[in-house]
């Protein structure tokens, strides 16, 4: 369903590239949408599609159960993980990893209003540039418009989620245990919140990019009157 919602977005953009939709002839009896109607259809399709995409991640196992997005310990902590598993302390590591993923799953839901603001701010020029651009043009648009806000908004949310799911505690237990080993020379303390923020933002954009790369040949989902009008006309062309 998510792919079909996003497909409607690209079809709408195709309509927007016409100089004046209202001056074109009628095709196969389908009413010709105005520029305003086409823009409305585009925004509706985007809102539905982004909502579905966020929904893929904002559920239990959205990160933990998906190998494409599953979070492990930060790169700087890989030595810690390997050492503790060799010493029979893998359970402590696994518990920390699980709760880190639960925190990310909880936090990504807060991305929705940020994406919706970017959609509402999209101009006709933005839409034309997207359709004329590369296959990931929409993802690039969202990266440009939302990355800074997503990172800023996610930072306190991720910290709260890490505490809510005790991920901070379990992670600190792992780090403290490793740092207290007599053989540990270089004590480590990687920044967990910044790591999770970066991974969560990357996962959101990756979800959009994956769909964008495959949507052009998927069936159309027309879920409102305006979408049926806009995309019924597009199909008749």
Locations of regions flagged by a protein language model:
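C-terminal motif of bacterial Sec signal peptides marking the signal peptidase cleavage site
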Residues: 14-17
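Immediate post-signal-peptide N-terminus of mature secreted/exported proteins
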Residues: 27-71, 83-86
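A cross-kingdom marker for long, charged
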Residues: 26, 200-237
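Bacterial N-terminal signal peptides that target proteins for export
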Residues: 1-6
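An amphipathic alpha-helical core segment
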Residues: 157-204
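Signal peptide-directed extracytoplasmic domains
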Residues: 61-102, 113
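Mid-length scaffold segments of soluble, non-membrane domains
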Residues: 90-164
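Bacterial signal peptide processing site
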Residues: 19-22
């Amino acid at each position: 369903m998510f792919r079909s919602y996003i497909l409607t977005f690209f079809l709408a953009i195709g309509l927007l590239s016409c100089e004046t939709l209202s001056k074109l002839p009628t095709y196969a009896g389908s009413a010709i949408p105005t520029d305003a109607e086409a823009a409305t259809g585009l925004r509706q399709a985007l809102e539905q599609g982004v909502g579905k995409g966020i929904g893929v991640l904002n559920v239990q196992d959205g990160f933990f159960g998906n190998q494409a997005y599953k979070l492990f310990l930060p790169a700087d902590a890989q030595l810690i993980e390997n050492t503790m598993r060799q010493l029979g302390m893998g359970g402590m590591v696994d518990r920390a990893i699980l709760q880190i993923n639960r925190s990310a799953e909880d936090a990504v839901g807060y991305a929705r209003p940020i994406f919706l603001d970017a959609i509402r701010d999209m101009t006709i020029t933005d839409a034309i540039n997207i359709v004329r651009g590369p296959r990931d043009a929409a993802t690039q648009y969202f990266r440009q418009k939302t990355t800074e806000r997503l990172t800023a908004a996610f930072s306190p949310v991720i910290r709260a989620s890490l505490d809510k799911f005790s991920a901070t505690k379990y992670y600190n237990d792992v780090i403290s245990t490793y740092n207290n080993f007599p053989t540990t020379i270089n004590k480590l303390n990687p920044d967990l919140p910044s790591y999770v923020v970066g991974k969560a933002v990357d996962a959101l954009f990756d979800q959009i990019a994956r769909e964008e790369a495959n949507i052009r040949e998927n069936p159309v989902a027309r879920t409102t009157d305006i979408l049926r009008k806009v995309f019924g006309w597009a199909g008749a062309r």
